[in-house]
Amino acid sequence: MSDGFAPKQENWLSRVARQVPGFRGYFEREDRRAADEAQRRALAERLHRSGAALGGLSQRWLAAGAIDALPLVDALRRRLDVLINRLGNAPRGYSAFFDRQQIDAARLEAVYQYDSELLWDVELLAKKIEEAVSSAAAADAPSLFNELTAAVAVVEERVAGRENVLRDL
């Protein structure tokens, strides 16, 4: 490419490709569906591993007698489960993105950008959940719930934005 975009794109894309299973498949039309599915499943699995730890938080708070905090954990778990299902079970290849021989570079960049941001946001959410599970006291339940719910909302918005970008291709 001689548009002056290639070096920046290559460095950025190389980083994403190393972190997301199957991401390199986006470059080839026939591999796009498989790459998209692999990416979504990897992100869903990351959230699932972190979300599973919320059960330990519930048990710890129950043992401490903080029964009032349990509905907050349950509500967070339900919302996280919906997000995990949305990521992991989305229809495979639901956009013209997966059928086109060539994609406009700007549109492809938008998809890559969403994927990179989604990867970052999922990792941030997973780490916040893991930190909360390892150290949160029941007295912190309301503020913790608000913080984690906000982090879930960021990922939900990122997933919706990515779906819109793919739909508009």
Predicted regions and their residues:
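Leu/Val/Ala/Ile-rich N-terminal alpha-helices, chiefly Sec-type signal peptides and the beginnings
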Residues: 1-62
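Preference for long, well-ordered alpha-helical segments
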Residues: 135-169
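Residue-level detector of solvent-exposed, low-hydrophobicity positions
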Residues: 27-34, 68, 101, 152
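Charged linear interaction tracts used for macromolecular binding and regulation
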Residues: 52-144
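Generic ordered-secondary-structure signal
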Residues: 4-7, 26, 39, 72-75, ...
